[in-house]
Amino acid sequence: MPDLTSVVQEIAEEMRERPDRGEVATYIPELARADPKAFGLVVIDADGQVAAAGDSDVPFSIQSISKVFTLTLALGMVGDRLWRRVGREPSGSPFNSIVQLEYERGIPRNPFINAGAIAVTDLILSRHQPREALGEILRFMQFLAQDSSIAIDEAVAASELRTGFRNAALANFMKAHGVIDNPVEYTLGVYFHHCAIAMTCRQLAEAGRFLAHSGRNPSTGHLVVQPERARRINAVMLTCGHYDGSGEFAFRVGLPGKSGVGGGILAVAPGRASIAVWSPGLDASGNSHLGRIALERLTKRLGWSIFGQ
């Protein structure tokens, strides 16, 4: 197999030279400040070897990638009862669409679109006060990444609170259908803040390692979830992790993954590696343009697609 570090560095160099970088998100004003030329890539293999290139130690707003971890946390709290509140099917619609909620009586299609993640956040909140719920989410991320310095970018959270009218509409619609239990402003406050967690590619790849190794971090030995649950989270990431671009990502990359409008992608090569990439420019579906291309290059070079070489 090609040397992992060399492959990662070659891909990063190619991405740095590409003129087609996508468009930085502007609907959350604070995200519009991101450097469109930034690019980072980290791969952590089963032995704990880290291959990093580019801006791999620059923190960025993980946004919807946090939904992987809130789903994991909520499943640990309520188990499969969670699936009564949220589905497991791709949406085929933009991540902040309200149309399907109207047709499907307030039940979100999956936990990775905004409505679904708000419903999952509400389940976590039901056991806590808002500050406690947010603290539990943040501590879980710090535990997984083995890094207590991970924090919430308060400027991003405030920016989302000021402009999150569509998310408020989603939450209120679900509240009207009995899907949301807590006060809408509490649920949205926790949701906006966990989406505003800032991490580096290195921290994010470390946090995702349990999904690549049957629910266990192979370096620490910590069992985060049972193997069956890890497989199922990966399955939802594969089919729903990139909004209405999920099919394209599966077709081109062939790995479970979750994107965020901050330009990050967490990808999982089962049994092999956890991967994090960051490039702020987005495609039409709200996914990192160069991030997806870089992951496609990586899986082709290493033969890591779950569908075969």
Swiss-Prot record:
Gene Ontology MF: a single term: glutaminase activity
Hydrolase listed as a keyword: yes
Reaction(s) the record says it catalyses: L-glutamine + H2O = L-glutamate + NH4(+)
Pfam families: Glutaminase
Transmembrane regions: none
Sorted UniProt keywords: Hydrolase
EC number: 3.5.1.2
GO biological process terms held by the UniProt record: glutamate biosynthetic process; glutamine catabolic process
Sites where the protein binds substrate: 64, 114, 160, 167, 191, 243, 261
Family affiliation: Belongs to the glutaminase family.
Subunit description: Homotetramer.
PANTHER family recorded: GLUTAMINASE
Protein name per the record: Glutaminase
Species assigned in the record: Methylobacterium nodulans (strain LMG 21967 / CNCM I-2342 / ORS 2060)
Lineage of the organism: Bacteria, Pseudomonadati, Pseudomonadota, Alphaproteobacteria, Hyphomicrobiales
